[in-house]
Amino acid sequence: MGDKAGTRVFKKSSPNCKVTVYLGKRDFVDHLDQVDPVDGVILVDPEYLKDRKVFVTLTCAFRYGREDLDVLGLSFRKDLYISTFQAFPPIAEERKANSRLQERLLKKLGQQAHPFYFTIPQNLPCSVTLQPGPEDTGKACGVDFEIRAFCAKSIEEKIHKRNSVRLVIRKVQYAPEKPGPQPMVETTRSFLMSDRSLHLEASLDKELYYHGEPISVNVHVTNNSTKTVKRLKISVRQYADICLFSTAQYKCPVAQVEADDQVSSSSTFCKVYTLTPTLDKNREKRGLALDGKLKHEDTNLASSTIVKDVTNKEVLGILVSYRVKVKLVISRGGDVSVELPFVLMHPKPTELPISRPQSAVPDSDPPIDTNLIEFETNSFSQDDDFVFEDFARLRLKGMADDKDDDC
C-alpha cells in the first residue's frame, strides 16, 4: 500500500453499476457554530441516464420501533429532515463553488460526473444507535443520516434498489478543546432524633473523559450523626433524552461499584473509587445508546451530546448525558445521594494530509484510517493521487444487510 498513499475517497455503486457516489469522508463534524458541509460527486452512465434527471437526497431519520413491527401502513420511523438536490441538469440557483476535492474528482471522472452539496442544519441530532436486544432483527432504533442517489424523470418517481445508491453518513461531535470545571458536589443530611448531621462531599478528578478512560470518584464523608453508613454504591449512569412527539428520559447504569465500607457515628471517611464505563460490560442491555455505526467493526457507548443553546426546543432526536451517582446506604433507612455530571467523548482526531507528494517514499505502510475498509485497487492513473475505497454498509449485531448486492 506504500505506493498508494494519497487522498482517500469513499465510493459506492448501485447494484447495476450505473450510478456511483464519491464522498471525501463519512463523518461530518458538528462544530456548534456550523456543521461540515456534505459535498460529493455522482457519476452516471450516460446510456443509462438518457432523458432522466439525477437526484441526490439527504435524510435524517429517527427509527423508534422495530422494523418488523411496521404493519398496516404504520411505520415506527420519523423523518426529521429531508433535502433534495438536483445534480443534473444543474439548477443555477442551487449551484455553489466546488470544493477542491470536487474539482479534482470532476477532472478525474469526466463529463458524466456531477457535484452535489448539502448543509446539515445545526438543530439536527448526532448519529446515535440504540442497542438491539438479543432477539431483535432488522434495522436498529436510533438516529441516522442517509444519502440516496438515483436517476428519475421526477423526484416523485418510485426508486428501485438496483439502480440507486444508499449510504449512511454520521453527524458527530468531538471533545471540546477547553474542558469545563472539575465537578464537585456536597450535601448535608439531618436525621430525626439526631442533633447533628451527616455531610457528604464527592468530586471527580476532571470534567471531560475519553471513551475507555477510568473515572476517579473522590468520596469524603463526615458523619456527626447517630446513624451508621453501612455501605456505599457508586455508579455511572447514561441518560438518554428522547425528543420526538414528547420528551422522555431513560437512564441506564453502565458501570457500578458497591463497597462494604462503613462509616460509624462521629467519624470521617475518605476514599477514591475508580470506574470505567465501557460497552463490553453492557452488551446485553437493550436500548442502551451507542455512537452511530457505519461498519461491521465495534462501536462504543454514545458520546455526550453538546447543545449550543439548551433553551432551543426544536432539537429532536436523542440527547445523551452522563452522571456519576454516589449513594450512602444508611442504617434504618434515609439514604443519602449526590450526582456529578461529566462529559464522555472522543478526542478530535488529528487531521490527515490531503495528499502526499509523488516523490515522497514512505518508510512503511501508512496507517489505515479507521473510516476506510475493504480496500479497492485504484484503477485510475496515479497522477491525481487518489485512493478509492468501497463504502461499507451499516451493520449491527443481529442486524440484516441491506439485501442489495454490490457490483
From Swiss-Prot:
Annotated SMART domains: Arrestin_C (SM01017)
GO cellular component: cytoplasm
Keyword Cytoplasm in annotation: yes
Domain of life: Eukaryota
Primary localization class, coarse: cytoplasm
UniProt keyword list: Cytoplasm, Sensory transduction
GO MF assignments: angiotensin receptor binding
InterPro entries xrefs: Arrestin (IPR000698), Arrestin-like_C (IPR014752), Arrestin-like_N (IPR011021), Arrestin_C-like (IPR011022), Arrestin_CS (IPR017864), Arrestin_N (IPR014753), Ig_E-set (IPR014756)
UniProt record, GO biological process: G protein-coupled receptor internalization; nervous system development; positive regulation of ERK1 and ERK2 cascade; signal transduction
UniProt keyword annotation of Transferase present: no
Cellular localisation: Cytoplasm
Pfam families, per database record: Arrestin_C, Arrestin_N
Family indicated by similarity: Belongs to the arrestin family.
Name by which UniProt lists this protein: Arrestin red cell isoform 1
Organism, scientific name: Oncorhynchus mykiss
